[in-house]
Curated annotation (Swiss-Prot):
Its EC number is 1.13.11.11. This is Tryptophan 2,3-dioxygenase. The keyword Calcium does not apply. GO terms for biological process: L-tryptophan catabolic process to acetyl-CoA; L-tryptophan catabolic process to kynurenine. It catalyses: L-tryptophan + O2 = N-formyl-L-kynurenine. Heme binds at residue 242. It holds the Pfam family Trp_dioxygenase. Its cofactor is heme. The gene is kynA. One of its GO terms (molecular function) is tryptophan 2,3-dioxygenase activity. It comes from Bordetella pertussis (strain Tohama I / ATCC BAA-589 / NCTC 13251). Keywords: Dioxygenase, Heme, Iron, Metal-binding, Oxidoreductase, Tryptophan catabolism. It is an enzyme of class 1 (oxidoreductase). InterPro entries: Trp/Indoleamine_2_3_dOase-like (IPR037217), Trp_2-3-dOase_bac (IPR017485), Trp_2_3_dOase (IPR004981).
Amino acid sequence: MQPTPTQRPEAIVHDEKAQLDFARDMSYGDYLHLDELLGAQHPLSPEHNEMLFIVQHQTSELWMKLMLHELRAAIAAIQQDRLQPAFKMLARVSKILEQLVSAWDVLATMTPPEYSALRPYLAHSSGFQSYQYRQIEYLLGNKNAAMLQPHAHRADLLAQVRAAFEAPSLYDEALRFLARSGLAVPAGALQRDWTQPYRADDQVEQAWLTVYRQSERYWNQYQLGEKLTDLEDAFRLWRFRHVTTVERIIGFKRGTGGTSGVTYLRKMLEVVLFPEIWKLRTDL
């Protein structure tokens, strides 16, 4: 529709009741603290592509902040036998992981020569040093005491990461819920050293098999198993895209943090977070 000679184009573009004066009101930018957020990118090199590298990792950290928020809330809900809210939170975590998976496509537009030009400016900084990522790994049950060390230089960060390291994981709380539901979960899975990686247990698998064979009776437990499956499936996809993106950009060079790079990341693909939920699919 074209404006008539007596109409101002602005009257068509703007809703007449839209708030346009923010001299004394909170604006969109004020609410989101956009000055601070958009002022947090400080390239160290003259390379055009460093902005992509920074924004990729900063946005990933924002999504991980939301993941931690949802994971902690889901764990608390499971502890209180509030399964429906927990399902919503776990589904959201899986969707966040989808966002993180697709983000690798953007970073993959960086070619090997482009990354090589900015790599010297990164020093020994590396993604495995992310204190939010480490907390996510710990909350999902991948406990490794050595990964506390990169945060030892900051007592405040170390305290956060250590708290996740020492707490029961999401899967630990899922097994506790099964036990409270009357299922035969062995004491060794319910009372153990939470700082140690979880080891698969045949009796735990039998408990999950009961859930899956009698899903109508154990509907919440069954749904919990499937939400955990969705989450680990999404996490595996994220790990895989991480490996392929890194290999595409740096090949088999060592990582900036001193790891073996792609070789190290491929080993992470072998980590199984919720082993019995996957094994039961063969045994059903």
